[in-house]
């Protein structure tokens, strides 16, 4: 494994000790987030009014609004929490960037992404991985049902077609089935989007690709959730399972998703996330809360990802218990990866060479501040233009 390059920038809160200036900075960040989110929601409303007749164009517009939201979040993070982002991945084939010969990671167009859940900002960093894979507009996230009622954001997330669950399988099964079947059919050009000649936009970008982000642990790691997880292990006679840095994963929802998406699914990615500086005895979700990250500038200096790819034919779906044991094995390997991470400050590969050459590569980057600001400004301008067209149409 190559050692990551040194990368350190400072957020706006770290550049001044003046409380008044910091207060103005917090106000700036809040205004930027609210105005950006509002422009995205108004843009979505315009799409609903102006493009109800074209499902392809409407979906492309929704995908663009998804991209705008993750660009907005990344631009704000670049200002307040400019972490070094280190992506380490296993591959049995060379992956090349179009601009140079160095290997670079990219999610496949139709994939499920599973990860350990340490803090509430995990999903932002995973969405960023999809964004740099040119799939930022094709992300789907499974969330708590209560989140769909958040003012402004809830409306936007419902338009994003995020999946909201109540953690009651009898209630959730139908909603989950409808969402997954629709994603699968559209990806295979057999769904609602196939009333048209192509499932691709003029730029040949897949309208119906999907990156489904799931957290099998169900919640983020904390003292309370750890105690609940250990109590469940005892009740389920899983006392032999000793996870030092993770919670026991739930397999039912993941197996259901894999089965429903199997006809179109390209790969399942297992992403292990590590944050530093953090001690093995600390709970990252307590140390780096959303409030601390966005309003106080308390953030991880490094965010490390270790990514493994599983092909669908490698996943045992024939039996619930066999699938759970497979997932548990993946989680034990993740736990060892995190143990090595806390010992050495970087992920150490435990890849096995089974008749193929496994290459482990690390790439270090940031939030690419040189391109984020022009991009979000272009989104603002485009949204403002479309809103103006909408207003003029209503007046006439």
From Swiss-Prot:
The domain of life for this entry's organism is Eukaryota
InterPro entries xrefs = Acyltransf_C, Plipid/glycerol_acylTrfase
Please verify whether the record's keywords include Cell wall biogenesis/degradation. no
User: Which of UniProt's keywords are assigned here?
Assistant: Acyltransferase, Lipid biosynthesis, Lipid metabolism, Membrane, Phospholipid biosynthesis, Phospholipid metabolism, Transferase, Transmembrane, Transmembrane helix
Pfam families assigned to the protein according to its UniProt record, in alphabetical order: Acyltransf_C (PF16076), Acyltransferase (PF01553)
Query: Iron-sulfur: present as a keyword of the record?
Result: no
Q: Where in the cell is it found?
A: Membrane
Motif HXXXXD motif covers: 117-122
Q: Which GO terms describe its cellular component?
A: endomembrane system; endoplasmic reticulum; membrane; mitochondria-associated endoplasmic reticulum membrane contact site; nucleus
CDD domains in alphabetical order: LPLAT_LCLAT1-like
Per its record, what are the GO molecular function terms? acyltransferase activity; lysophosphatidic acid acyltransferase activity
**Bilayer topology:** Multi-pass membrane protein
* Membrane spanning stretches: 27-47, 69-89, 123-143, 372-392
Which EC numbers characterise this protein's activity in its record?
2.3.-.-
- An example of a Gene Ontology BP annotation on this entry? phosphatidylserine acyl-chain remodeling
Enzyme class per UniProt:
transferase
Describe the family membership recorded for this protein in Swiss-Prot or TrEMBL.
Answer: Belongs to the 1-acyl-sn-glycerol-3-phosphate acyltransferase family.
Record comment regarding domains:
The HXXXXD motif is essential for acyltransferase activity and may constitute the binding site for the phosphate moiety of the glycerol-3-phosphate.
Instruction: Name it.
Output: Uncharacterized acyltransferase YDR018C
